[in-house]
Amino acid sequence: MIQMQSTLDAADNSGARRVMCIKVLGGSHRRYAHIGDIIKITVKEAIPRGKVKKGDVLKAVVVRTRKGVRRQDGSVIRFDRNACVLLNDTTEQPIGTRIFGPVTRELRNTKFMKIVSLAPEVL
C-alpha cells in the first residue's frame, strides 16, 4: 500500500534511484495505491547523467509492494521493497529501456504490457 510521502525504489534505468509518492492518481481523495496503479512521484535521489534528475515530477506505475497482492487461488505475492517504474507524463510509456527485478502478472491485465515484456521475471 503506497500513500503520499511513501518512498520507493526506481526499478528501471531512467536514472532515478529513490522516489517519493506525492499523489495517488485515480479518483478524488484516493488514499492507497497497489500494484498496477499510477502515482505521481518526485525524484529524491538520482545518478549522474541519467534521463531524469533530482526534483523532477513524473508519473510512475507501482510494480512491487511489501503489502503484496492476493491471487484468486489464495496465494499472496509479497516483496522486500516497494518499487515503481517511471513513466512519460503524456504517453504513460516507460522512460527507461530496462526493468530490474521481478514484476507480477497483474500488470498484464492493465495497459503495461511493455513493462511485462521488458521485465526479466514475471511472477
From Swiss-Prot:
GO cellular component, one term: cytosolic large ribosomal subunit
GO biological processes: translation
Disulfide bond annotation, renumbered to this chain: none
Family statement: Belongs to the universal ribosomal protein uL14 family.
The protein, known as: Large ribosomal subunit protein uL14
Database matches in PROSITE patterns: RIBOSOMAL_L14 (PS00049)
Keyword Metal-binding: no
Native source organism of the sequence: Photobacterium profundum (strain SS9)
Coiled coil ranges: none
Subunit structure: Part of the 50S ribosomal subunit. Forms a cluster with proteins L3 and L19. In the 70S ribosome, L14 and L19 interact and together make contacts with the 16S rRNA in bridges B5 and B8.
MF GO annotations: large ribosomal subunit rRNA binding; structural constituent of ribosome
Gene3D superfamilies the record matches: Ribosomal protein L14
Cited function: Binds to 23S rRNA. Forms part of two intersubunit bridges in the 70S ribosome.
Top-level division of the source organism's lineage: Bacteria
Keyword line: Ribonucleoprotein, Ribosomal protein, RNA-binding, rRNA-binding
Pfam families reported in the protein's UniProt record: Ribosomal_L14 (PF00238)
Keyword Ribosomal protein carried by entry: yes
